[in-house]
Amino acid sequence: MTKKVAIVGAGIVGATAAYQLSKKGIDVTVFDAGVGQATKAAAGIICPWLSQRRNKDWYQLVSHGAAYYPQLMDQLREDGVSELPYEQVGAYIFKHTEKQLAKVEEMAVERRVDAPMIGEVRALTPEDVACVIPGWSNPDGALYCSGGGRVDGELLVTLLLEQAEKNGARVAREKVTLEAVGEEVRVRLGGEVQAFDAVVLSSGAWVKELIEPLGYYVDVRPQKGQLIELTVETTEDTSKWPVCMLHGEIDILPFPDGKILVGATHENTQGFDLVPDEELLNGMYEEACASLPSLKNAKRSGVRVGTRAYTSDFLPFFGEVPSTKNAFVASGLGSSGLTSGVWIGECLARMAAGEEVGFSVEKYTPQNYVRKV
């Protein structure tokens, strides 16, 4: 029986795993250096059903993630959490032509058979959108999906770790390294090497530098992401505005009290750089203002910068580290990490606890991405 688990990396995967393991009464220690976490810089739209990505394995994963959110919120509510970080407010996806909208609508209706959480699906004119979001001026039509939601990734991770600590988990804001003793992986913090029944490696793009010293090749690369936090003075209830996925990479996420997030960039050549790029930020801001001119009067209250992890085929992986008996790993979640990450964290918690996962994980095996050299 698993009694003692280490989790290295406290983003969405690690925080979810820590929370679930702590609820099982397992001794959990979380290690996280707290630098560049992708979760804190993620836009936070939970609406995978409208994606036109053709990879069925990816869709299966994000669809499970989206369906898992209400269950996770119920657990936090039972723990006494009142300010929940996730809410189903609906989603708009914008397309240039009616033909493009019709294609997405047909796909959403087809997927709703297996994913009833999608809810109501209908095409809207720009005028329809402006009735919900006053001042909206984007000329594109939109498809509305009532099941779409938004999540504040930073708040979610904070709450999960807080609840895990209340359940007895320990959180160490420290950078650690790994050591292999035969097939067992141990954690080194300073001069001390600690042994655990299970070690969960969930450090995102940093998993490469964590595992490679043990003699592995790791197929993971970093991608820089930036988003803008804005505050708008308005009498409108922005908490009920749907999230908006514009044509291209820009999303607009309304939150309560006039808080608006705009993002995010997808920068493949910046490595682990975390310096805000004003040119890119201003470009995103101008693009958002073209759709919602009231943002021109908004106050920029912050900038979030993080590092996502990608694999060469853009599919996440999670499961046992090859040639070990107690280590589990997850990475490569990319820009949909907030959607898939909660489910991957749940699956890893079950694996680390020695339980049946109840989900077909073979297609996501780390063996395709983490290899002994």
What are these regions (language model features)?
Residues 190-198:
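Core beta-strand elements of the Rossmann-like FAD/NAD(P) dinucleotide-binding domain
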Residues 82-93, 110, 117-167, 265-270, ...:
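Helix-loop-beta segment of a Rossmann-like dinucleotide-binding subdomain
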Residues 171-186:
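A conserved short coil-to-beta-strand element within the FAD-binding core of flavoproteins
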Residues 60-63, 97-101, 143-159, 275-280, ...:
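Short beta-strand to alpha-helix junction loop
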Residues 45-132, 287-289:
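Dinucleotide-binding Rossmann-like beta1-alpha1 core, especially the glycine-rich loop
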Residues 294-373:
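C-terminal catalytic lobe of FAD-dependent flavoproteins
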Residues 16-24, 31-33, 44-45, 82-87, ...:
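Active-site substrate-recognition segment that forms the wall
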Residues 2-11:
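Beta1/beta-strand and adjacent pyrophosphate-binding region of the FAD-binding site
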